[in-house]
C-alpha cells in the first residue's frame, strides 16, 4: 500500500473509533495536517452526532466548515473527550514530534484539554528514537536569533522555516518557526521542558509531557492499535 492509502486507512479507523467512543452531543477535537484532513473527510459522514468541533488551525477550521461542522472556540468548551491528530514521529512511549504543518501551539493547547489523544499515523512515523524529522519550535519573531543560538548550544541546527514563495513562514499566531535538525531525542520529556523554558519560545513541537493515549498505526497488515 502507498503512504496515501495507509493514511486513508488509518483516518477511517479513527472515524470508527470516535463513532464508538465519543458520546453523542460531545465536542470533537481535531488536529491539522494531511492525515487529519482525511479524518475530517471520514468523520463528516456522521457529523450530526457531535455538538461541534474544536480545531487546531485555520486550515482545519475551513475544512470542517466545508463539511458543515460547527466549529467552536475553545473558550466556549468545557470538555473534549477525544482529540485526533497526526504526528511527524512517534516513539514507543507515545511521545511525538509534531508541527510539520505549522500548528504545533494550537495542537498542544487543544490536546491539553482533551481526555484522550488519539494519534493517527502511517507506519513510517513510528521510530525508535525521534530526531530524524527536524524538530519545529514556534518562536516570537524578535527572539528568533537569540533562540537559535540556544538551540545550537543544545546541539541542534536550527533553520528558519520559509514559504514556497521564499518568504518567512508565519504561524496562525503570527510567529515564526525554527526547524531544528541534528537532535537525537533520547529524553523527550526533558528536552521539551528545556526548550520551552527558553525566553522567546512559544512552544516546541515535542508532545511528551502530554503524549498520545492511543496510536492507530496504518501498516500493510491493516491498522494496529496501541494504548499507552
UniProtKB/Swiss-Prot annotation:
Write out the similarity annotation: Belongs to the ribose 5-phosphate isomerase family.
Q: Which reaction is the catalytic activity of this chain?
A: aldehydo-D-ribose 5-phosphate = D-ribulose 5-phosphate
Q: Does the keyword DNA repair apply?
A: no
Gene behind the chain: rpiA
Lineage top rank: taxon:
Bacteria
Please name the HAMAP family in this protein's record: Rib_5P_isom_A
- GO terms, molecular function: ribose-5-phosphate isomerase activity
Q: What is the lineage of its organism?
A: Bacteria, Pseudomonadati, Pseudomonadota, Betaproteobacteria, Burkholderiales
What does the entry give for GO biological process? D-ribose metabolic process; pentose-phosphate shunt, non-oxidative branch
Q: What is its EC number?
A: 5.3.1.6
The reply to whether Aminoacyl-tRNA synthetase figures as a keyword in the UniProt entry is: no
Can you quote a single GO CC term?
Answer: cytosol
According to the record's subunit comment, the protein's assembly and interactions are: Homodimer.
The residues responsible for catalysis, as annotated, are 107
Supply the Pfam families for this chain: Rib_5-P_isom_A
Q: What does this protein do?
A: Catalyzes the reversible conversion of ribose-5-phosphate to ribulose 5-phosphate.
Q: In which pathway does it act?
A: Carbohydrate degradation; pentose phosphate pathway; D-ribose 5-phosphate from D-ribulose 5-phosphate (non-oxidative stage): step 1/1
Q: Could you list this entry's UniProt keywords, alphabetically sorted.
A: Isomerase
Q: Where does substrate bind?
A: 32-35, 85-88, 98-101, 125
Give the protein name, as stated in the record. Answer: Ribose-5-phosphate isomerase A
